[in-house]
Amino acid sequence: MNKICLKYLLLPWIKNIPKKYISNLKMDSRTLTPGDLFIAVPGIKKDGRHFIVQAINKKAAAILCETKKKDKHGIFKYIKNVILIYFFKLSENVSLLANRFYKEPGKRLKIIGITGTNGKTTVTQLINQWSTILGTKTATMGTLGNGFYNSLQPTNNTTSSPIFIQLFLSKVLEKQAELVTMEVSSHGLIQHRVKEVPFYIAIFTNLTQDHLDYHENLEKYESAKWLLFSTHKVKKIILNADDQYGKIWLKKLLNFYTVAVTIQNRKQKKYSTKWINATNIEQNNNSIYITFESSWGTGRISSCLIGRFNVTNLLLSLACLLELGYSLSDLIHTSEKIIPVQGRMELFSYVKKPTFIIDYAHTPDALKKTLNAIHSHYQRYIWCIFGCGGERDQKKRPIMGAIAEKMSDKVIITNDNPRNEKEKKIIQDILNGCKNKEKILIIPDRKKAISYAYFGAKYHHIILIAGKGHEEKQIIQNRSINYSDKKIVLNLLGKNI
């Protein structure tokens, strides 16, 4: 990459900086190379300002250091020939700096931002998949990875760092991407990671209890999600208007371009610019058929995705693609080509073997909707295997225990990612929500729990494995070990095929 002048980069904020050229922007001192600009800001776990000495020793070209004092903004000094510049509210401006450094890549792309408690990954991947089928070069950023369809690179965060986001947009633009779908987490919004991303469309899936370990309460969590629609650059907004928050937000956004997405609920369309409403849903074992009416016309799409929540996910994706200018006829005719998203209601069904369903459901609402979907499609004996993550929202644990007990025939409580929390404490928290202990088994080892269910189930039974979905690691204490629900399931089924 060509070097950029630090004086030019900082011009919108600081005027008197000496001419100096930098190669890259870095927030992690471990990845620094000579000539980089080190951006030292406080984080949740570590403070980048504590690593300034390492940055100097690694021959950073310059250092930007966050200061809480407004009068220190723009002051600079030299330490071992490295310029250190104080920057007021630097954390809030990293996205803007990165956007300027990478020459505003978002302006030459159509970027779709998807937020919500559940469904972000599915909608992100559906739009990616559907648009790719129709010939568009679409890149994606999110939980399943970053990149183009079928070539995603693993990622640690749902929403990446503000620097990486702009770098990614720059790289996919070089590879002739036209469209980018991006999961936008509440953490990413509060931490200003997408502040300078020009979203063409923002989509809201739903809002239910999650991340209360971080946000403290549902009101603060709602406020975080609302930031995407209230303070960010968005041209069009698509809302799940069946969701209680979606309904409220639709009325708050009367002066904006909105699309209301509903199931058998025409009342919300009077508050929106455009709308789409499912009028009839037909379900069988492995398929769903959705008849709809909309501002673009009427039609019927078919899909192998199951569950009422996936009707909403499909309609949100359909509305987005219609707003992007795709033809309704083309979308209807290609809907049946869409395949399930990895780790989201992912089905493994073989003759005379129990049917496995792997799903990422890790919130009370998601678990309830997943079990509802299984009931409506299969009407069979259901095993539910799940746990809850350690060092995360503890309030949801008994609620999820109650849901699993009520909606399943047999429940196995196991480990999810216990992290540094005691597994017995997590399991007991879940058990506190359960009344009928006779239908519940405790098998902390997740692999053993899945094996027990497989060998104990009859061929017509359904075994739901909830919570980890696509994940290929399990975090126990400070160790991240190789682990995959899917690999265990395929191994079990393969032994007897």
From Swiss-Prot:
UniProt GO molecular function: ATP binding; magnesium ion binding; UDP-N-acetylmuramoylalanyl-D-glutamate-2,6-diaminopimelate ligase activity
Binding site residues for UDP-N-acetyl-alpha-D-muramoyl-L-alanyl-D-glutamate: S29, N157, T158, T159, S185, Q191, R193
Family matches, as InterPro entries: Mur-like_cat_sf, Mur_ligase_C, Mur_ligase_C_dom_sf, Mur_ligase_cen, Mur_ligase_N, MurE/MurF_N, UDP-N-AcMur-Glu-dNH2Pim_ligase
A Pfam family it matches: Mur_ligase_C
Keyword Flavoprotein: no
Keywords: ATP-binding, Cell cycle, Cell division, Cell shape, Cell wall biogenesis/degradation, Cytoplasm, Ligase, Magnesium, Nucleotide-binding, Peptidoglycan synthesis
Cofactor: Mg(2+)
Motif stretch (Meso-diaminopimelate recognition motif): 416-419
N6-carboxylysine: modified positions: K225
Entry's EC annotation: 6.3.2.13
PANTHER family referenced in this protein's UniProt entry, alphabetically: MUR LIGASE FAMILY MEMBER, UDP-N-ACETYLMURAMOYL-L-ALANYL-D-GLUTAMATE--2,6-DIAMINOPIMELATE LIGASE MURE HOMOLOG, CHLOROPLASTIC
Protein known as: UDP-N-acetylmuramoyl-L-alanyl-D-glutamate--2,6-diaminopimelate ligase
